[in-house]
Protein backbone atom coordinates (compact mmCIF):
# COMPACT_ATOMS: atom_id res chain seq x y z
CA UNK A 1 0.00 0.00 0.00
CA UNK A 2 2.79 2.44 0.93
CA UNK A 3 4.71 1.65 -2.26
CA UNK A 4 1.56 2.12 -4.32
CA UNK A 5 1.18 5.65 -2.97
CA UNK A 6 4.81 6.73 -3.25
CA UNK A 7 6.38 4.71 -6.08
CA UNK A 8 6.18 7.53 -8.61
CA UNK A 9 7.88 10.12 -6.40
CA UNK A 10 10.58 7.60 -5.45
CA UNK A 11 11.16 6.66 -9.10
CA UNK A 12 11.44 10.28 -10.25
CA UNK A 13 13.64 11.22 -7.29
CA UNK A 14 16.00 8.31 -7.91
CA UNK A 15 16.16 9.18 -11.62
CA UNK A 16 17.06 12.77 -10.70
CA UNK A 17 19.81 11.68 -8.30
CA UNK A 18 21.16 9.13 -10.77
CA UNK A 19 21.21 11.73 -13.53
CA UNK A 20 23.24 14.08 -11.35
CA UNK A 21 25.61 11.34 -10.16
CA UNK A 22 26.37 10.05 -13.66
CA UNK A 23 27.17 13.57 -14.85
CA UNK A 24 29.40 14.42 -11.88
CA UNK A 25 31.09 11.53 -10.07
CA UNK A 26 33.73 10.58 -12.67
CA UNK A 27 34.50 14.16 -13.75
CA UNK A 28 35.26 16.08 -10.54
CA UNK A 29 38.80 14.79 -9.95
CA UNK A 30 39.98 15.20 -13.58
CA UNK A 31 38.42 18.68 -13.70
CA UNK A 32 40.35 19.79 -10.60
CA UNK A 33 43.66 18.27 -11.73
CA UNK A 34 44.39 19.38 -15.26
CA UNK A 35 47.05 17.39 -17.06
CA UNK A 36 50.36 19.25 -16.95
CA UNK A 37 49.24 22.05 -14.61
CA UNK A 38 47.28 20.48 -11.75
CA UNK A 39 44.74 23.31 -11.96
CA UNK A 40 41.13 23.43 -13.15
CA UNK A 41 40.27 22.03 -16.57
CA UNK A 42 37.14 21.86 -18.73
CA UNK A 43 35.83 19.62 -21.50
CA UNK A 44 34.07 20.59 -24.72
CA UNK A 45 36.83 22.38 -26.61
CA UNK A 46 37.26 26.14 -26.71
CA UNK A 47 33.65 27.28 -26.14
CA UNK A 48 33.64 26.70 -22.34
CA UNK A 49 36.88 28.64 -22.03
CA UNK A 50 35.37 31.64 -23.77
CA UNK A 51 32.41 31.32 -21.40
CA UNK A 52 34.93 31.43 -18.53
CA UNK A 53 36.39 34.62 -20.01
CA UNK A 54 32.95 36.24 -20.05
CA UNK A 55 32.29 35.16 -16.44
CA UNK A 56 35.65 36.53 -15.27
CA UNK A 57 34.73 39.89 -16.81
CA UNK A 58 31.32 39.87 -15.07
CA UNK A 59 32.91 39.15 -11.69
CA UNK A 60 35.58 41.80 -12.17
CA UNK A 61 33.42 44.59 -13.64
CA UNK A 62 29.92 43.76 -12.29
CA UNK A 63 28.52 44.27 -15.79
CA UNK A 64 27.90 42.21 -18.90
CA UNK A 65 30.78 41.48 -21.26
CA UNK A 66 29.61 43.31 -24.40
CA UNK A 67 32.66 44.27 -26.48
CA UNK A 68 35.67 41.96 -26.63
CA UNK A 69 38.69 43.75 -28.09
CA UNK A 70 40.52 40.44 -28.52
CA UNK A 71 37.92 39.22 -31.04
CA UNK A 72 38.60 40.32 -34.62
CA UNK A 73 41.75 41.99 -33.26
CA UNK A 74 42.61 44.88 -33.45
CA UNK A 75 39.12 46.16 -34.32
CA UNK A 76 37.27 44.15 -31.68
CA UNK A 77 33.85 42.53 -31.82
CA UNK A 78 30.89 41.68 -29.62
CA UNK A 79 30.73 38.85 -27.12
CA UNK A 80 28.51 36.41 -29.08
CA UNK A 81 27.01 34.85 -25.95
CA UNK A 82 23.64 36.08 -24.62
CA UNK A 83 23.83 37.00 -20.93
CA UNK A 84 21.59 34.69 -18.91
CA UNK A 85 23.67 31.51 -18.84
CA UNK A 86 26.98 33.25 -18.13
CA UNK A 87 25.34 35.42 -15.45
CA UNK A 88 23.77 32.37 -13.77
CA UNK A 89 27.23 30.82 -13.46
CA UNK A 90 28.78 34.08 -12.25
CA UNK A 91 26.08 34.58 -9.61
CA UNK A 92 26.50 30.96 -8.58
CA UNK A 93 30.13 31.74 -7.82
CA UNK A 94 29.11 34.80 -5.80
CA UNK A 95 26.66 32.66 -3.79
CA UNK A 96 29.31 30.00 -3.08
CA UNK A 97 32.08 32.47 -2.19
CA UNK A 98 31.23 32.81 1.56
CA UNK A 99 31.41 29.03 2.01
CA UNK A 100 34.72 28.37 0.21
CA UNK A 101 38.31 29.43 0.69
CA UNK A 102 39.85 31.91 -1.73
CA UNK A 103 38.28 34.76 -3.65
CA UNK A 104 35.12 34.82 -5.76
CA UNK A 105 37.02 33.72 -8.87
CA UNK A 106 38.03 30.50 -7.12
CA UNK A 107 34.45 29.90 -5.97
CA UNK A 108 33.20 30.60 -9.50
CA UNK A 109 35.07 27.54 -10.76
CA UNK A 110 32.70 25.29 -8.79
CA UNK A 111 29.70 27.07 -10.27
CA UNK A 112 31.14 27.03 -13.79
CA UNK A 113 31.90 23.32 -13.62
CA UNK A 114 28.89 22.17 -11.60
CA UNK A 115 25.90 24.16 -12.87
CA UNK A 116 25.76 22.47 -16.32
CA UNK A 117 25.42 19.11 -14.55
CA UNK A 118 22.67 20.57 -12.34
CA UNK A 119 20.80 21.90 -15.38
CA UNK A 120 21.23 18.55 -17.11
CA UNK A 121 19.88 16.57 -14.17
CA UNK A 122 16.93 18.95 -13.67
CA UNK A 123 15.81 18.30 -17.26
CA UNK A 124 14.49 14.98 -15.95
CA UNK A 125 11.61 16.86 -14.26
CA UNK A 126 9.91 18.56 -17.26
CA UNK A 127 10.35 15.38 -19.29
CA UNK A 128 8.68 13.32 -16.56
CA UNK A 129 5.91 15.91 -16.21
CA UNK A 130 5.22 15.88 -19.96
CA UNK A 131 5.12 12.08 -20.12
CA UNK A 132 2.88 11.83 -17.06
CA UNK A 133 0.46 14.51 -18.29
CA UNK A 134 -0.08 13.01 -21.74
CA UNK A 135 0.73 9.29 -21.42
CA UNK A 136 0.29 8.38 -17.75
CA UNK A 137 2.40 7.85 -14.63
CA UNK A 138 4.16 4.81 -16.05
CA UNK A 139 5.36 6.82 -19.03
CA UNK A 140 6.46 9.60 -16.66
CA UNK A 141 8.69 7.20 -14.72
CA UNK A 142 10.14 5.64 -17.88
CA UNK A 143 10.68 9.02 -19.53
CA UNK A 144 12.56 10.29 -16.47
CA UNK A 145 14.99 7.36 -16.58
CA UNK A 146 15.40 7.54 -20.35
CA UNK A 147 16.35 11.21 -20.03
CA UNK A 148 18.58 10.62 -17.01
CA UNK A 149 20.72 8.18 -19.01
CA UNK A 150 20.21 9.45 -22.57
CA UNK A 151 23.74 9.22 -24.07
CA UNK A 152 23.31 12.28 -26.29
CA UNK A 153 22.20 14.36 -23.31
CA UNK A 154 24.64 13.07 -20.70
CA UNK A 155 27.61 13.75 -22.97
CA UNK A 156 26.62 17.45 -23.25
CA UNK A 157 25.78 18.09 -19.60
CA UNK A 158 28.65 16.64 -17.58
CA UNK A 159 30.58 18.35 -14.79
CA UNK A 160 33.17 20.78 -16.26
CA UNK A 161 31.39 21.22 -19.61
CA UNK A 162 30.63 24.93 -19.19
CA UNK A 163 28.52 25.42 -22.30
CA UNK A 164 24.91 26.53 -22.63
CA UNK A 165 23.59 23.20 -24.00
CA UNK A 166 22.17 21.82 -20.74
CA UNK A 167 20.67 25.22 -19.81
CA UNK A 168 19.00 25.51 -23.21
CA UNK A 169 17.47 22.03 -23.19
CA UNK A 170 16.10 22.47 -19.66
CA UNK A 171 14.12 25.59 -20.52
CA UNK A 172 13.25 24.40 -24.03
CA UNK A 173 11.70 21.29 -22.45
CA UNK A 174 9.79 23.51 -20.02
CA UNK A 175 8.57 25.65 -22.90
CA UNK A 176 7.24 22.67 -24.81
CA UNK A 177 5.61 21.26 -21.66
CA UNK A 178 3.65 24.44 -21.03
CA UNK A 179 2.77 24.82 -24.71
CA UNK A 180 1.51 21.24 -24.94
CA UNK A 181 -0.63 21.83 -21.84
CA UNK A 182 -2.01 25.02 -23.38
CA UNK A 183 -3.03 23.52 -26.74
CA UNK A 184 -4.42 20.40 -25.08
CA UNK A 185 -6.72 22.33 -22.75
CA UNK A 186 -7.80 25.28 -24.88
CA UNK A 187 -9.81 23.21 -27.38
CA UNK A 188 -11.43 24.45 -30.59
CA UNK A 189 -14.87 25.64 -29.47
CA UNK A 190 -16.00 28.94 -30.95
CA UNK A 191 -14.81 31.92 -28.93
CA UNK A 192 -16.68 34.44 -31.08
CA UNK A 193 -19.92 33.90 -32.93
CA UNK A 194 -18.85 35.90 -35.97
CA UNK A 195 -15.69 36.18 -38.06
CA UNK A 196 -14.25 39.44 -39.36
CA UNK A 197 -11.32 40.48 -41.54
CA UNK A 198 -10.56 43.47 -39.29
CA UNK A 199 -7.23 42.78 -37.49
CA UNK A 200 -8.80 44.11 -34.28
CA UNK A 201 -11.00 41.02 -34.40
CA UNK A 202 -7.90 39.06 -33.37
CA UNK A 203 -7.53 41.28 -30.30
CA UNK A 204 -11.17 40.62 -29.46
CA UNK A 205 -10.53 36.88 -29.78
CA UNK A 206 -7.50 37.06 -27.48
CA UNK A 207 -9.58 38.85 -24.85
CA UNK A 208 -12.26 36.17 -25.14
CA UNK A 209 -9.61 33.46 -24.77
CA UNK A 210 -8.32 35.02 -21.54
CA UNK A 211 -11.89 35.19 -20.24
CA UNK A 212 -12.98 31.67 -21.21
CA UNK A 213 -9.68 29.77 -20.94
CA UNK A 214 -7.54 31.57 -18.32
CA UNK A 215 -5.53 28.47 -17.36
CA UNK A 216 -4.60 27.67 -20.96
CA UNK A 217 -3.58 31.28 -21.65
CA UNK A 218 -1.48 31.32 -18.47
CA UNK A 219 0.26 28.19 -19.71
CA UNK A 220 0.87 29.89 -23.06
CA UNK A 221 2.50 32.82 -21.24
CA UNK A 222 4.66 30.42 -19.21
CA UNK A 223 5.71 28.74 -22.45
CA UNK A 224 6.67 32.16 -23.81
CA UNK A 225 8.68 32.94 -20.68
CA UNK A 226 10.50 29.61 -20.99
CA UNK A 227 11.35 30.17 -24.66
CA UNK A 228 12.44 33.74 -23.84
CA UNK A 229 14.77 32.31 -21.19
CA UNK A 230 16.31 30.14 -23.89
CA UNK A 231 16.65 33.24 -26.10
CA UNK A 232 18.62 34.96 -23.34
CA UNK A 233 21.00 32.00 -23.17
CA UNK A 234 21.41 30.94 -26.82
CA UNK A 235 20.91 32.77 -30.11
CA UNK A 236 19.67 29.63 -31.85
CA UNK A 237 16.47 29.57 -29.78
CA UNK A 238 14.21 30.13 -32.80
CA UNK A 239 14.32 26.47 -33.81
CA UNK A 240 11.89 25.60 -31.00
CA UNK A 241 9.44 28.28 -32.10
CA UNK A 242 9.75 27.11 -35.71
CA UNK A 243 8.61 23.64 -34.61
CA UNK A 244 5.68 25.18 -32.71
CA UNK A 245 4.71 27.23 -35.76
CA UNK A 246 4.91 24.20 -38.09
CA UNK A 247 2.47 22.32 -35.84
CA UNK A 248 0.24 25.41 -35.63
CA UNK A 249 0.16 25.74 -39.43
CA UNK A 250 -0.82 22.09 -39.81
CA UNK A 251 -3.46 22.35 -37.07
CA UNK A 252 -5.11 25.42 -38.61
CA UNK A 253 -5.20 23.71 -42.02
CA UNK A 254 -6.99 20.74 -40.43
CA UNK A 255 -9.41 23.10 -38.66
CA UNK A 256 -10.22 24.84 -41.93
CA UNK A 257 -11.10 21.62 -43.70
CA UNK A 258 -13.16 20.36 -40.74
CA UNK A 259 -14.90 23.70 -40.14
CA UNK A 260 -13.48 24.17 -36.65
CA UNK A 261 -12.60 27.44 -35.01
CA UNK A 262 -8.87 28.23 -34.90
CA UNK A 263 -9.31 31.34 -32.75
CA UNK A 264 -8.46 29.58 -29.42
CA UNK A 265 -5.13 28.16 -30.58
CA UNK A 266 -4.39 31.36 -32.54
CA UNK A 267 -4.92 33.48 -29.43
CA UNK A 268 -2.67 31.19 -27.40
CA UNK A 269 0.18 31.12 -29.92
CA UNK A 270 0.13 34.88 -30.52
CA UNK A 271 0.34 35.54 -26.77
CA UNK A 272 3.13 32.98 -26.45
CA UNK A 273 5.08 34.36 -29.42
CA UNK A 274 4.75 37.97 -28.28
CA UNK A 275 5.92 37.02 -24.78
CA UNK A 276 8.96 35.35 -26.30
CA UNK A 277 9.52 38.41 -28.49
CA UNK A 278 9.21 41.11 -25.83
CA UNK A 279 11.23 39.66 -22.94
CA UNK A 280 14.63 39.28 -24.69
CA UNK A 281 14.14 42.38 -26.88
CA UNK A 282 16.13 44.76 -24.62
CA UNK A 283 19.22 42.58 -24.99
CA UNK A 284 18.95 41.95 -28.72
CA UNK A 285 18.02 45.60 -29.26
CA UNK A 286 21.23 46.86 -27.64
CA UNK A 287 22.76 49.22 -30.21
CA UNK A 288 26.27 47.98 -29.44
CA UNK A 289 25.32 44.40 -30.26
CA UNK A 290 23.36 45.12 -33.46
CA UNK A 291 21.53 41.79 -33.26
CA UNK A 292 17.99 42.88 -34.16
CA UNK A 293 18.40 42.15 -37.88
CA UNK A 294 21.29 39.74 -37.54
CA UNK A 295 20.70 36.38 -39.22
CA UNK A 296 21.90 34.54 -36.11
CA UNK A 297 20.14 36.96 -33.78
CA UNK A 298 16.58 38.27 -33.72
CA UNK A 299 15.84 38.39 -37.46
CA UNK A 300 14.40 34.84 -37.72
CA UNK A 301 12.00 35.60 -34.86
CA UNK A 302 10.52 38.53 -36.81
CA UNK A 303 9.62 36.11 -39.61
CA UNK A 304 8.22 33.47 -37.24
CA UNK A 305 6.05 36.00 -35.37
CA UNK A 306 4.96 37.65 -38.63
CA UNK A 307 3.95 34.38 -40.27
CA UNK A 308 2.14 33.31 -37.09
CA UNK A 309 0.03 36.48 -36.97
CA UNK A 310 -0.73 36.40 -40.72
CA UNK A 311 -1.59 32.69 -40.57
CA UNK A 312 -3.83 33.24 -37.56
CA UNK A 313 -5.53 36.25 -39.14
CA UNK A 314 -6.35 34.34 -42.35
CA UNK A 315 -7.84 31.26 -40.68
CA UNK A 316 -9.89 33.27 -38.16
CA UNK A 317 -11.02 36.14 -40.38
CA UNK A 318 -12.31 33.78 -43.06
CA UNK A 319 -13.39 30.98 -40.77
CA UNK A 320 -16.86 30.71 -42.28
CA UNK A 321 -15.74 30.88 -45.92
CA UNK A 322 -15.18 27.81 -48.14
CA UNK A 323 -11.91 26.22 -47.05
CA UNK A 324 -10.58 25.86 -50.60
CA UNK A 325 -10.97 29.59 -51.18
CA UNK A 326 -9.16 30.37 -47.92
CA UNK A 327 -6.28 28.03 -48.77
CA UNK A 328 -5.91 29.57 -52.24
CA UNK A 329 -5.96 33.07 -50.77
CA UNK A 330 -3.46 32.11 -48.07
CA UNK A 331 -1.19 30.52 -50.65
CA UNK A 332 -1.36 33.71 -52.71
CA UNK A 333 -0.42 35.91 -49.76
CA UNK A 334 2.44 33.56 -48.83
CA UNK A 335 3.71 33.58 -52.42
CA UNK A 336 3.74 37.38 -52.48
CA UNK A 337 5.60 37.57 -49.15
CA UNK A 338 8.16 34.92 -50.04
CA UNK A 339 8.57 36.35 -53.54
CA UNK A 340 9.26 39.77 -52.06
CA UNK A 341 11.94 38.31 -49.80
CA UNK A 342 13.53 36.54 -52.77
CA UNK A 343 13.57 39.70 -54.89
CA UNK A 344 15.12 41.67 -52.03
CA UNK A 345 17.73 38.93 -51.76
CA UNK A 346 18.53 39.15 -55.49
CA UNK A 347 18.79 42.94 -55.24
CA UNK A 348 21.11 42.47 -52.24
CA UNK A 349 18.81 44.55 -50.05
CA UNK A 350 18.08 41.75 -47.58
CA UNK A 351 19.26 38.25 -46.72
CA UNK A 352 15.83 37.20 -45.46
CA UNK A 353 15.40 34.51 -48.11
CA UNK A 354 18.63 32.80 -47.11
CA UNK A 355 17.73 33.10 -43.42
CA UNK A 356 14.43 31.31 -44.04
CA UNK A 357 15.73 28.60 -46.37
CA UNK A 358 18.83 27.77 -44.31
CA UNK A 359 17.36 28.05 -40.80
CA UNK A 360 19.39 31.10 -39.87
CA UNK A 361 22.38 29.57 -41.72
CA UNK A 362 22.40 26.53 -39.41
CA UNK A 363 21.69 24.28 -42.42
CA UNK A 364 23.83 26.13 -44.93
CA UNK A 365 26.45 24.23 -46.91
CA UNK A 366 29.63 26.16 -47.65
CA UNK A 367 33.38 25.86 -47.21
CA UNK A 368 33.36 27.45 -43.76
CA UNK A 369 30.74 25.05 -42.39
CA UNK A 370 32.64 22.21 -44.00
CA UNK A 371 35.42 22.81 -41.46
CA UNK A 372 33.06 22.57 -38.44
CA UNK A 373 32.65 19.00 -37.19
CA UNK A 374 29.29 19.55 -35.47
CA UNK A 375 27.81 21.05 -38.66
CA UNK A 376 28.34 17.79 -40.56
CA UNK A 377 25.76 15.03 -40.82
CA UNK A 378 26.57 12.35 -38.22
CA UNK A 379 27.17 8.74 -39.15
CA UNK A 380 24.08 6.59 -38.80
CA UNK A 381 25.73 4.55 -36.05
CA UNK A 382 26.51 7.71 -34.09
CA UNK A 383 22.97 8.98 -34.60
CA UNK A 384 21.33 5.79 -33.35
CA UNK A 385 23.75 5.38 -30.44
CA UNK A 386 23.17 8.92 -29.11
CA UNK A 387 19.52 8.11 -28.40
CA UNK A 388 19.78 4.36 -28.05
CA UNK A 389 18.91 2.34 -31.20
CA UNK A 390 15.63 0.95 -29.89
CA UNK A 391 14.60 4.26 -28.31
CA UNK A 392 15.22 6.03 -31.62
CA UNK A 393 13.15 3.54 -33.62
CA UNK A 394 10.35 3.44 -31.03
CA UNK A 395 10.24 7.25 -30.92
CA UNK A 396 9.95 7.56 -34.70
CA UNK A 397 7.20 4.96 -34.74
CA UNK A 398 5.36 6.80 -31.98
CA UNK A 399 5.82 10.05 -33.90
CA UNK A 400 4.06 8.63 -36.96
CA UNK A 401 1.30 7.24 -34.74
CA UNK A 402 0.88 10.63 -33.05
CA UNK A 403 0.72 12.32 -36.44
CA UNK A 404 -2.22 10.09 -37.35
CA UNK A 405 -3.89 10.70 -33.99
CA UNK A 406 -3.38 14.44 -34.42
CA UNK A 407 -5.99 14.43 -37.15
CA UNK A 408 -8.59 13.07 -34.71
CA UNK A 409 -10.45 14.34 -31.67
CA UNK A 410 -10.12 12.66 -28.28
CA UNK A 411 -12.23 9.50 -28.15
CA UNK A 412 -14.90 9.75 -25.38
CA UNK A 413 -14.65 5.96 -24.93
CA UNK A 414 -10.88 6.18 -24.40
CA UNK A 415 -10.14 9.64 -22.96
CA UNK A 416 -6.67 8.61 -21.78
CA UNK A 417 -5.41 8.24 -25.36
CA UNK A 418 -3.77 11.45 -26.54
CA UNK A 419 -5.28 12.85 -29.74
CA UNK A 420 -5.80 16.25 -31.33
CA UNK A 421 -3.54 19.33 -31.19
CA UNK A 422 -1.14 18.15 -28.47
CA UNK A 423 -0.55 14.89 -30.33
CA UNK A 424 0.12 16.88 -33.49
CA UNK A 425 2.69 19.09 -31.72
CA UNK A 426 4.52 16.03 -30.40
CA UNK A 427 4.48 14.41 -33.85
CA UNK A 428 5.87 17.49 -35.59
CA UNK A 429 8.46 17.92 -32.82
CA UNK A 430 9.82 14.36 -33.09
CA UNK A 431 9.82 14.30 -36.89
CA UNK A 432 11.52 17.68 -37.33
CA UNK A 433 13.98 17.00 -34.50
CA UNK A 434 14.90 13.68 -36.12
CA UNK A 435 15.45 15.39 -39.47
CA UNK A 436 17.62 18.06 -37.85
CA UNK A 437 19.68 15.46 -36.00
CA UNK A 438 20.04 13.49 -39.23
CA UNK A 439 21.29 16.65 -41.01
CA UNK A 440 23.85 17.98 -38.51
CA UNK A 441 25.55 16.56 -35.44
CA UNK A 442 24.93 19.73 -33.44
CA UNK A 443 21.19 18.99 -33.36
CA UNK A 444 21.42 15.50 -31.86
CA UNK A 445 21.53 16.96 -28.37
CA UNK A 446 18.50 19.16 -29.10
CA UNK A 447 16.46 16.10 -30.06
CA UNK A 448 17.02 14.23 -26.79
CA UNK A 449 13.97 15.56 -24.86
CA UNK A 450 11.40 14.50 -27.43
CA UNK A 451 13.18 11.17 -27.92
CA UNK A 452 12.73 10.45 -24.21
CA UNK A 453 9.08 11.56 -24.29
CA UNK A 454 8.06 9.59 -27.36
CA UNK A 455 10.25 6.64 -26.42
CA UNK A 456 8.49 6.32 -23.06
CA UNK A 457 5.09 6.61 -24.75
CA UNK A 458 6.05 3.84 -27.18
CA UNK A 459 7.29 1.57 -24.37
CA UNK A 460 4.04 2.01 -22.43
CA UNK A 461 2.00 1.42 -25.59
CA UNK A 462 3.91 -1.77 -26.42
CA UNK A 463 3.56 -3.08 -22.88
CA UNK A 464 -0.18 -2.47 -22.83
CA UNK A 465 -0.65 -4.07 -26.24
CA UNK A 466 1.31 -7.17 -25.22
CA UNK A 467 -1.67 -8.49 -23.26
CA UNK A 468 -0.23 -7.89 -19.82
CA UNK A 469 -3.68 -7.56 -18.20
CA UNK A 470 -4.75 -10.98 -19.45
CA UNK A 471 -1.34 -12.31 -18.40
CA UNK A 472 -1.91 -11.13 -14.82
CA UNK A 473 -5.41 -12.63 -14.74
CA UNK A 474 -4.09 -15.98 -15.97
CA UNK A 475 -1.20 -15.85 -13.50
CA UNK A 476 -3.56 -15.28 -10.56
CA UNK A 477 -5.95 -17.96 -11.74
CA UNK A 478 -3.13 -20.53 -11.89
CA UNK A 479 -2.24 -19.85 -8.27
CA UNK A 480 0.26 -17.67 -6.43
CA UNK A 481 0.20 -19.03 -2.89
CA UNK A 482 3.90 -19.96 -2.65
CA UNK A 483 7.17 -19.09 -4.41
CA UNK A 484 7.07 -22.37 -6.34
CA UNK A 485 3.46 -21.79 -7.37
CA UNK A 486 4.24 -18.25 -8.46
CA UNK A 487 7.17 -19.47 -10.57
CA UNK A 488 5.14 -22.19 -12.30
CA UNK A 489 2.24 -19.76 -12.81
CA UNK A 490 4.59 -17.28 -14.45
CA UNK A 491 5.87 -19.95 -16.86
CA UNK A 492 2.35 -21.12 -17.66
CA UNK A 493 0.95 -17.63 -18.16
CA UNK A 494 3.91 -16.76 -20.37
CA UNK A 495 3.18 -19.72 -22.63
CA UNK A 496 -0.44 -18.64 -23.02
CA UNK A 497 0.41 -14.98 -23.61
CA UNK A 498 3.63 -15.04 -25.62
CA UNK A 499 3.50 -11.29 -26.26
CA UNK A 500 4.39 -10.50 -22.63
CA UNK A 501 7.72 -12.39 -22.44
CA UNK A 502 8.59 -11.25 -25.98
CA UNK A 503 8.03 -7.58 -25.18
CA UNK A 504 9.71 -8.11 -21.81
CA UNK A 505 12.89 -9.35 -23.50
CA UNK A 506 12.87 -6.36 -25.86
CA UNK A 507 12.49 -3.96 -22.92
CA UNK A 508 15.33 -5.66 -21.02
CA UNK A 509 17.54 -5.17 -24.08
CA UNK A 510 16.43 -1.54 -24.39
CA UNK A 511 17.02 -0.56 -20.77
CA UNK A 512 20.30 -2.46 -20.34
CA UNK A 513 21.73 -0.94 -23.50
CA UNK A 514 20.47 2.52 -22.57
CA UNK A 515 21.96 2.30 -19.08
CA UNK A 516 25.37 1.14 -20.36
CA UNK A 517 25.54 3.87 -23.00
CA UNK A 518 24.37 6.48 -20.50
CA UNK A 519 26.99 5.58 -17.89
CA UNK A 520 29.67 5.47 -20.59
CA UNK A 521 28.69 9.00 -21.66
CA UNK A 522 29.45 10.32 -18.18
CA UNK A 523 32.95 8.81 -17.83
CA UNK A 524 35.84 10.82 -19.33
CA UNK A 525 37.79 8.96 -21.97
CA UNK A 526 41.01 7.44 -20.72
CA UNK A 527 39.95 7.47 -17.06
CA UNK A 528 40.35 4.38 -14.88
CA UNK A 529 36.63 4.46 -14.07
CA UNK A 530 35.91 3.44 -17.65
CA UNK A 531 37.78 0.15 -17.26
CA UNK A 532 36.47 -0.45 -13.73
CA UNK A 533 32.84 -0.13 -14.84
CA UNK A 534 33.54 -2.29 -17.88
CA UNK A 535 34.92 -5.07 -15.67
CA UNK A 536 31.95 -4.77 -13.29
CA UNK A 537 29.48 -5.20 -16.16
CA UNK A 538 31.50 -8.13 -17.48
CA UNK A 539 31.35 -9.75 -14.05
CA UNK A 540 27.56 -9.48 -13.84
CA UNK A 541 27.16 -12.25 -16.41
CA UNK A 542 27.42 -15.77 -14.93
CA UNK A 543 30.51 -17.65 -16.14
CA UNK A 544 28.37 -20.57 -17.24
CA UNK A 545 26.91 -18.43 -20.02
CA UNK A 546 30.43 -17.87 -21.39
CA UNK A 547 31.48 -21.52 -21.10
CA UNK A 548 32.53 -23.14 -24.37
CA UNK A 549 30.44 -26.29 -24.83
CA UNK A 550 31.25 -28.21 -28.01
CA UNK A 551 32.48 -25.04 -29.72
CA UNK A 552 29.44 -22.96 -28.77
CA UNK A 553 28.58 -20.58 -25.91
CA UNK A 554 25.55 -18.47 -25.06
CA UNK A 555 27.67 -15.31 -24.73
CA UNK A 556 31.10 -14.34 -26.00
CA UNK A 557 33.70 -16.49 -24.27
CA UNK A 558 36.78 -14.65 -25.58
CA UNK A 559 39.56 -13.88 -23.07
CA UNK A 560 38.94 -10.71 -21.08
CA UNK A 561 41.69 -8.44 -19.73
CA UNK A 562 40.97 -7.52 -16.11
CA UNK A 563 41.50 -4.15 -14.48
CA UNK A 564 44.81 -3.74 -12.68
CA UNK A 565 48.42 -2.59 -12.89
CA UNK A 566 50.06 -5.90 -13.83
CA UNK A 567 51.41 -6.84 -17.23
CA UNK A 568 48.28 -8.83 -18.05
CA UNK A 569 45.90 -6.11 -16.83
CA UNK A 570 44.80 -2.66 -17.97
CA UNK A 571 44.12 0.55 -16.02
CA UNK A 572 42.15 2.18 -18.86
CA UNK A 573 40.25 1.01 -21.89
CA UNK A 574 42.63 2.12 -24.66
CA UNK A 575 40.01 1.07 -27.19
CA UNK A 576 39.80 -2.52 -25.91
CA UNK A 577 36.87 -2.38 -23.47
CA UNK A 578 33.86 -4.54 -24.18
CA UNK A 579 31.13 -2.17 -23.00
CA UNK A 580 32.71 1.22 -22.28
CA UNK A 581 34.77 3.64 -24.36
CA UNK A 582 32.29 4.67 -27.05
CA UNK A 583 31.15 7.95 -25.50
CA UNK A 584 32.39 10.27 -22.79
CA UNK A 585 33.85 13.77 -22.44
CA UNK A 586 37.52 14.44 -23.06
CA UNK A 587 39.75 16.64 -20.92
CA UNK A 588 42.62 18.54 -22.50
CA UNK A 589 46.13 17.14 -22.68
CA UNK A 590 49.23 18.64 -21.09
CA UNK A 591 50.28 20.28 -24.36
CA UNK A 592 47.03 22.25 -24.58
CA UNK A 593 46.99 23.19 -20.89
CA UNK A 594 50.60 24.35 -20.78
Predicted regions span which residues?
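Alpha-helical transmembrane segments at the extracellular/periplasmic loop-to-helix junctions
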Residues: 296-316, 328-408, 422-423
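Transmembrane alpha-helices and membrane-interface helical segments
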Residues: 125-129, 174-182, 244-255, 273, ...
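Membrane-interface helix-loop-helix junctions at transmembrane boundaries of multi-pass membrane enzymes
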Residues: 204-214, 257-264, 320-330, 393-427
Amino acid sequence: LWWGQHWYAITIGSALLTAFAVRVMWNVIPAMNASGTGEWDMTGGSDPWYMKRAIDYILAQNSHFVIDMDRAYPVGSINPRPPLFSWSLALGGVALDPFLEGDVHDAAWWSIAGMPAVFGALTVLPIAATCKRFFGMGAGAIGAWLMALMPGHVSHSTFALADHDAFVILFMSLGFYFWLCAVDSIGNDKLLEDSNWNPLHLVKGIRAAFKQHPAAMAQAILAGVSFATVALGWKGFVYGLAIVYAAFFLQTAINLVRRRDSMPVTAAIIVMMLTTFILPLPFYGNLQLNLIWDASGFQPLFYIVGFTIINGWIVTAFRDKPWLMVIIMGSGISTVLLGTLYILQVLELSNGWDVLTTGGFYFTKNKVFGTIAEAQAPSRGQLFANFGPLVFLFSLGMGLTSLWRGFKNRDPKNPSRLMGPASLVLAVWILLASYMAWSAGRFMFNATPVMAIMGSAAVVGLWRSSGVREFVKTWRRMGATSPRARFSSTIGAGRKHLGVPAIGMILILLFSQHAIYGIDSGIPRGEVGEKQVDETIYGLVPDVLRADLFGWSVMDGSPYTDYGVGEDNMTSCRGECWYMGTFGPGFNGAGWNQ
